[in-house]
């Protein structure tokens, strides 16, 4: 084992670029000193010819006389110097000769595959082998030969793989010792043979290895039945793979390609350091073994080949009809190549050169390809820059007669632009070809962004990107921003001239800059001039109320903050007059209420709500008493005033903090004690003084009054009686009493009876109408289509009826505050409302049916409620907030979409119609970018994919039925025509969206998910055309006639072919040939990632929008 104190250096290098792993066939183990001299430090070098072998590195180990692989596999990287002699290599150098003896190997690190072996002996060995390795075929006879260097009167012993094999008496030993092996077999004869004198140390032995192919000569394979190729120039057929293992200096399928002097490796890309390869032993994978480089021979490869011989170990004889014999190449003839001049030369031809556009400061990678006979070698192809600097290739790959060299230039500058040359040099000629390198400067805006609007939590900025310096086109626009007091920048990618920054801090200054990017790596330019803008002040919490819940609890509530106000709340509460009872609570931004518990009964508490955004402002507060734990006291300070002949005013005081909810007055005539009248009056929470006017009293009559109060614990004791004496009858009163008492009683009696009758009739009608509506909803929800085609269980197996299993979130009528009408049709209406749900206030869109809506309209409306309940939440489907029934009408509250429906949103983006000056100034036909339009389409596809997975059919998919919510997310809405089956056949004809309907729906009233895909294709056309009317100018009758004949919507002028191809796939006549929504989503996702302009919104000459025909849309 190579210990740390015996190794001066153990270095490992790997090429860390992406690529395939190193193969053992690409590895060469170089042994510079098989016989170790005391004068030199022994070493080994393992080289891989695969320079693109990312992550896989080489490891060296020892196998004989002791397996010591783990330490030799350790190492560190070479220092990165240019040029490196071998881009992927491992080397080891010993400081002690005693450890540099035995059999060593090289393999791929962490691999259990094949190894490449070499051997080292000490110079004091008494014998030397004829060669380090001997390769024979199965069944052949061979002599393992050694030469004696030192004489000793002792017997010799031969060990094989460390075990005794043979010994010779001293009398039989000559200067050349032969150990014969007959009928060689791999399993019994292959191995390491070491010879020494019997008394000598094992480390003084001479080593050679016998490699026995498992097949007879000329064959390979598991059964040795496959014929080997004719391996030329000393190549050996691999008995496992059938490949020719080529000697160093040759390559090709049959080793017929000559590399020349000083080259080695699988592709002849490696060069010896001195260019000569003298005194180096090259070892390859079995069954080749070890040999000298081409042109050299001997155990240490120090001897040149004699005349007439060439190749590795000088084993090949020149047979040259013409020309001369070169010991490195074989026969050398003018105009021909090959070891026997069997191939005619052809001039190299450079191909695949392309002009290059690159951004300044990035690395340029250029491939130069040249073909010829013989194919150019690594180093034959060079790159010459525009300023005549020559650059060497970092790697070369050769396939057949074509070689491709890879060049890399760090940090290209503008001065490097111009005509570059790819040059090929060989022994006979030089050819070159030119290409253009354009170096672009990334763009930088010249003006800062401009503020267009602001709020407490947002800024709306005009990017102001033109004019800019540098080169276009502009690929992406990024807005950089940070608080003025911070150091870290945030960024958002812009998809139009305006950018809205949300979730900002109120009353904060923000530093903003615009950064432009052009296509390609390094295309991001420097940020433009900075501008500082401030967000606005947030409004304080409003509607703060504190109310009693129990004797020990209060409820504090306030109106929920606007959507963009995300500040937290701090609530401080204390008992009145007791500062030591202060309690503080921290609440999140979506809070609008909190319960206070563990309080004292009959105590007053004060609470203040502070907003984290309203620093330095006065904050609202409220106070309330907890409910009482005892009966209330009777009213106090009772007084009577403003007495007349028929009336009087009664005032009294209510005790504070006693939770009094009602006050009761009982009064009677003094002379008629059996007739008593009683009045109950509600007491407001903070009301301490009360007033009541007694009317209809008798003149000149005495009355006795008593009062008491009621709270959560019960009634108080009665107050002491209070006397009242009315004044004598006035003259006008007497006259009226004499002549009008009877008439008054008749009028009052008749009016009372009439009111009672009307009230009773109204209650009966209301109850009947409510029962009728409930029965209608239940019957609608239970109604099933006439024909089903579904993989789900048949209808009679369904558990109960739909209406009984339907559970929807209920809203209270008192929790809905209507604000405005958002839209209405012939039979329905949508209103904007503010609702309270789960203690929180939020915006909502509330839908209701009009009085004269038909049975079908009510069925579709109730069906929409059922579909939304069964679908559940999804980010691309409008969310159901709740439902409410009031006076026999059903109200449906859904998520409020601030940007309206997609169709109107697209048409509003037609800026050439709404703001021509802006359109011309910014050369755009729409405020929406290609990315935004594709994002809308992807959102709808994602929602429809979820809908189809739930086995629901929409039946009315169109841009008008898609809403644009917060952050411009598209959400599918209007499920009034949806059904929960895979196939639905409509049994009646109603209003039909003909322009969006599939052929099978028009002809046979069949609706499936595939028909929804057709409708999606039309929706995609609407998005690309910015809200155009499908088949504008055509009637529905013409559509019925032309669609079955193959007529389809024309491609919009601003539409990419790939997007229109997706539309056409959706409009295929056979439903099963149309793509699924998941496939559509996959295609759109890929388009979004590529950031290509699939929908061109640039304003070009004679630009026209797709036509809009509202009357045609209403007709279908």
Swiss-Prot record:
<dbReference type="InterPro" id="IPR003961">
    <property type="entry name" value="FN3_dom"/>
</dbReference>
<feature type="disulfide bond">
    <location>
        <begin position="272"/>
        <end position="277"/>
    </location>
</feature>
<feature type="domain" description="EGF-like 1">
    <location>
        <begin position="214"/>
        <end position="256"/>
    </location>
</feature>
<keyword id="KW-0675">Receptor</keyword>
<feature type="disulfide bond">
    <location>
        <begin position="368"/>
        <end position="422"/>
    </location>
</feature>
<dbReference type="GO" id="GO:0043235">
    <property type="term" value="C:receptor complex"/>
</dbReference>
<feature type="disulfide bond">
    <location>
        <begin position="228"/>
        <end position="237"/>
    </location>
</feature>
<dbReference type="GO" id="GO:0004714">
    <property type="term" value="F:transmembrane receptor protein tyrosine kinase activity"/>
</dbReference>
<dbReference type="InterPro" id="IPR000719">
    <property type="entry name" value="Prot_kinase_dom"/>
</dbReference>
<dbReference type="GO" id="GO:0045766">
    <property type="term" value="P:positive regulation of angiogenesis"/>
</dbReference>
<keyword id="KW-0808">Transferase</keyword>
<feature type="active site" description="Proton acceptor">
    <location>
        <position position="956"/>
    </location>
</feature>
<feature type="modified residue" description="Phosphotyrosine; by autocatalysis">
    <location>
        <position position="852"/>
    </location>
</feature>
<feature type="disulfide bond">
    <location>
        <begin position="46"/>
        <end position="106"/>
    </location>
</feature>
<dbReference type="InterPro" id="IPR036116">
    <property type="entry name" value="FN3_sf"/>
</dbReference>
<feature type="disulfide bond">
    <location>
        <begin position="320"/>
        <end position="331"/>
    </location>
</feature>
<feature type="glycosylation site" description="N-linked (GlcNAc...) asparagine">
    <location>
        <position position="637"/>
    </location>
</feature>
<feature type="signal peptide">
    <location>
        <begin position="1"/>
        <end position="21"/>
    </location>
</feature>
<dbReference type="InterPro" id="IPR011009">
    <property type="entry name" value="Kinase-like_dom_sf"/>
</dbReference>
<keyword id="KW-0965">Cell junction</keyword>
<dbReference type="GO" id="GO:0051897">
    <property type="term" value="P:positive regulation of phosphatidylinositol 3-kinase/protein kinase B signal transduction"/>
</dbReference>
<comment type="function">
    <text>Tyrosine-protein kinase that acts as a cell-surface receptor for angiopoietins and regulates angiogenesis, endothelial cell survival, proliferation, migration, adhesion and cell spreading, reorganization of the actin cytoskeleton, but also maintenance of vascular quiescence. Can activate or inhibit angiogenesis, depending on the context. Angiopoietin signaling triggers receptor dimerization and autophosphorylation at specific tyrosine residues that then serve as binding sites for scaffold proteins and effectors.</text>
</comment>
<feature type="domain" description="EGF-like 2">
    <location>
        <begin position="258"/>
        <end position="302"/>
    </location>
</feature>
<feature type="disulfide bond">
    <location>
        <begin position="283"/>
        <end position="290"/>
    </location>
</feature>
<dbReference type="GO" id="GO:0007507">
    <property type="term" value="P:heart development"/>
</dbReference>
<feature type="domain" description="Ig-like C2-type 1">
    <location>
        <begin position="46"/>
        <end position="126"/>
    </location>
</feature>
<feature type="glycosylation site" description="N-linked (GlcNAc...) asparagine">
    <location>
        <position position="590"/>
    </location>
</feature>
<dbReference type="Pfam" id="PF00041">
    <property type="entry name" value="fn3"/>
</dbReference>
<feature type="modified residue" description="Phosphotyrosine; by autocatalysis">
    <location>
        <position position="1094"/>
    </location>
</feature>
<feature type="glycosylation site" description="N-linked (GlcNAc...) asparagine">
    <location>
        <position position="143"/>
    </location>
</feature>
<dbReference type="Pfam" id="PF10430">
    <property type="entry name" value="Ig_Tie2_1"/>
</dbReference>
<dbReference type="InterPro" id="IPR013783">
    <property type="entry name" value="Ig-like_fold"/>
</dbReference>
<feature type="binding site">
    <location>
        <begin position="822"/>
        <end position="830"/>
    </location>
    <ligand>
        <name>ATP</name>
    </ligand>
</feature>
<dbReference type="InterPro" id="IPR050122">
    <property type="entry name" value="RTK"/>
</dbReference>
<dbReference type="Pfam" id="PF07714">
    <property type="entry name" value="PK_Tyr_Ser-Thr"/>
</dbReference>
<feature type="domain" description="Fibronectin type-III 3">
    <location>
        <begin position="634"/>
        <end position="729"/>
    </location>
</feature>
<dbReference type="GO" id="GO:0043410">
    <property type="term" value="P:positive regulation of MAPK cascade"/>
</dbReference>
<feature type="glycosylation site" description="N-linked (GlcNAc...) asparagine">
    <location>
        <position position="425"/>
    </location>
</feature>
<keyword id="KW-0547">Nucleotide-binding</keyword>
<comment type="similarity">
    <text>Belongs to the protein kinase superfamily. Tyr protein kinase family. Tie subfamily.</text>
</comment>
<keyword id="KW-0325">Glycoprotein</keyword>
<feature type="binding site">
    <location>
        <position position="847"/>
    </location>
    <ligand>
        <name>ATP</name>
    </ligand>
</feature>
